[in-house]
Amino acid sequence: MDKNELVQKAKLAEQAERYDDMAACMKSVTEQGAELSNEERNLLSVAYKNVVGARRSSWRVVSSIEQKTEGAEKKQQMAREYREKIETELRDICNDVLSLLEKFLIPNASQPESKVFYLKMKGDYYRYLAEVAAGDDKKGIVDQSQQAYQEAFEISKKEMQPTHPIRLGLALNFSVFYYEILNSPEKACSLAKTAFDEAIAELDTLSEESYKDSTLIMQLLRDNLTLWTSDTQGDEAEAGEGGEN
């Protein structure tokens, strides 16, 4: 199938909410080796975000059931095996995306904006791996995530307006990484607050086409800050989960 047909099919799959098909189409487009247009880049991102999102959500539900069935040996074993099956799917999806990023997307990114977008994506998918990692593996995965976010963060500060939706989305997800993966609420709050304040200070630089995206992410940054600064014990597990880009 040629590139245009694959992109058309991906859009059709998106409308049908068949995200596995959508991801497969955009994976094929990426493997053709040319740099993706903004539209193609967004299709790829939306497809995999939905594909991995379904597994992350299932994993959280089954993990919680597994913890609650302590003492009921049979039920707990069934939940554990099911969680492990979901984990395998989740890892395969993340490794798929990370391999596309390493082989094609990051090396081919000619603009700072694309580079930041793909490095953020790399940080995100290592973060999803970190959520289900245990033991010796975990530290290496967490480091990979942090390095990708950090590199993206430095480029974004140098090359993009504080109101740019990609720069804001990166700050949002990097702060969630600090809060949830590194358990550093102070660092998470400081990063989110700085990003929010810098964007507010330059609201007049907001372009018409990104106005909606930017203000939505600013709202998410503020929601997370509210949640994290109250930091009540009961909110711990959920904090930041709604607030991701």
UniProtKB/Swiss-Prot annotation:
The record marks 56, 127 as: Interaction with phosphoserine on interacting protein. Pfam families: 14-3-3. The modification N-acetylmethionine is found at residue 1. GO terms for biological process: angiogenesis; cellular response to glucose starvation; ERK1 and ERK2 cascade; establishment of Golgi localization; Golgi reassembly; lung development; negative regulation of innate immune response; negative regulation of protein localization to nucleus. CDD domains: 14-3-3_beta_zeta. The modification Phosphoserine is found at residues 58, 184, 207, 210. It is found in: Cytoplasm; Melanosome. The modification N6-acetyllysine is found at residues 3, 68. The delta, brain-specific form differs from the zeta form in being phosphorylated. Phosphorylation on Ser-184 by MAPK8; promotes dissociation of BAX and translocation of BAX to mitochondria. Phosphorylation on Thr-232; inhibits binding of RAF1. Phosphorylated on Ser-58 by PKA and protein kinase C delta type catalytic subunit in a sphingosine-dependent fashion. Phosphorylation on Ser-58 by PKA; disrupts homodimerization and heterodimerization with YHAE and TP53. The keyword Cytoplasm applies. The modification Phosphothreonine is found at residue 232. One of its GO terms (cellular component) is glutamatergic synapse. GO terms for molecular function: DNA-binding transcription factor binding; identical protein binding; phosphoserine residue binding; protein domain specific binding; protein kinase binding; protein phosphatase binding; protein sequestering activity; transmembrane transporter binding. Its main location: cytoplasm. SUPFAM superfamilies: 14-3-3 protein. Keywords: Acetylation, Cytoplasm, Phosphoprotein. InterPro entries: 14-3-3, 14-3-3_CS, 14-3-3_dom_sf, 14-3-3_domain. The keyword Phosphoprotein applies. Homodimer. Heterodimerizes with YWHAE. Homo- and heterodimerization is inhibited by phosphorylation on Ser-58. Interacts with FOXO4, NOXA1, SSH1 and ARHGEF2. Interacts with CDK16 and with WEE1 (C-terminal). Interacts with MLF1 (phosphorylated form); the interaction retains it in the cytoplasm. Interacts with BSPRY. Interacts with Thr-phosphorylated ITGB2. Interacts with Pseudomonas aeruginosa exoS (unphosphorylated form). Interacts with BAX; the interaction occurs in the cytoplasm. Under stress conditions, MAPK8-mediated phosphorylation releases BAX to mitochondria. Adapter protein implicated in the regulation of a large spectrum of both general and specialized signaling pathways. Binds to a large number of partners, usually by recognition of a phosphoserine or phosphothreonine motif. Binding generally results in the modulation of the activity of the binding partner. Promotes cytosolic retention and inactivation of TFEB transcription factor by binding to phosphorylated TFEB. Induces ARHGEF7 activity on RAC1 as well as lamellipodia and membrane ruffle formation. In neurons, regulates spine maturation through the modulation of ARHGEF7 activity. Belongs to the 14-3-3 family. This is 14-3-3 protein zeta/delta. It comes from Mus musculus (Mouse). The gene is Ywhaz.
